[in-house]
Amino acid sequence: MLGVARMQKLFVLAVSILASMPGLRASTLLQLSLNDMIRQSTSIVRGKAQLAYVAQKGSVIYTHYQIQVSATLKGTHATTVDIAVMGGVANGAHQLVAGAPELINGQEYVLFLWTSKSGLTQIIGLSQGLFRISTNSSGQALLRRAAATELMLNAAGQPVTDSDYQMSLIGLQTRIQDVLNGAAK
């Protein structure tokens, strides 16, 4: 069985290779459970997104967003976080990466983030690590993520179907503490 760090490196490498291929529009996602994302994330934050800039690094175009952090659920607190999402338009070149999330300016999210050794911070699992926040009629914050439409494989390499995901922010905070304290498997 592959270790978490090795699986994460292989996933990032595979997505980077796929993204660098001109004209390629398909992605294959490694299915991550909520507990996987909690464990593998270097930080989990709640905040509002603002488009910052687009830059090319090697053959990959990244769209950068500035996240105005209102709460840190895991990791070291910062008031802002710069995140990079694969894909965008730079120097007249358009690069589309299937499975890469699109953030909306001013929208509030919970983001599961991973920072590489080079300092590049990305959403873990592409769209899997991005949850949109809304409020229900009683004022409770709810997190929602639509099912990924891209091909998704489990850890054994078998195709699986993703599903929509919804939970309360309070439920997520409890789950994070349980996972980090070893109470959740």
Q: What is the predicted role of each segment?
A:
Residues 3, 10-11, 17-185:
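Transition segments tied to proteolytic processing and entry into folded domains
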